[in-house]
């Protein structure tokens, strides 16, 4: 007896659909004042579609409070997704603040700082020594 495996392509398609639907539902259906302007960056589904990690960024408001509010509203959002998606199992939603942008900015700052330090050291090494 063979088990039916889900296609990786189907997993990606469902994750993309959840991302689009959640973006719209959060904007139109969730009225929590702790949730400002939110962008859903990505959705990661487990192979059995039981759980979904939703990565978001918040343009306004405190990211921790936004995450708390989104996780609080996850049951309501799950029910709304159930009405939209045509799949047997709608995943339990777990919201996570996506720190990729902040980490990228910090890495860029560190690289720039290292390059300026290196350039300064090179300039000092190239300068002729002064003899008195």
From Swiss-Prot:
Record carries keyword Cytoplasm: yes
Pfam families: RBFA (PF02033)
One GO CC term on file: cytosol
UniProt entry keywords in alphabetical sequence: Cytoplasm, Ribosome biogenesis
GO biological process, one term: maturation of SSU-rRNA
Disordered, as annotated region: 113-132
Entry GO MF terms: ribosomal small subunit binding
Location within or outside the cell: Cytoplasm
Entry annotated with the keyword Cytoplasm: yes
Subunit structure as annotated in this protein's UniProt entry: Monomer. Binds 30S ribosomal subunits, but not 50S ribosomal subunits or 70S ribosomes.
Role of this protein: One of several proteins that assist in the late maturation steps of the functional core of the 30S ribosomal subunit. Associates with free 30S ribosomal subunits (but not with 30S subunits that are part of 70S ribosomes or polysomes). Required for efficient processing of 16S rRNA. May interact with the 5'-terminal helix region of 16S rRNA.
Family: Belongs to the RbfA family.
Protein name: Ribosome-binding factor A
Taxonomic source organism: Burkholderia ambifaria (strain MC40-6)
Organism lineage: Bacteria, Pseudomonadati, Pseudomonadota, Betaproteobacteria, Burkholderiales
This protein's encoding gene: rbfA
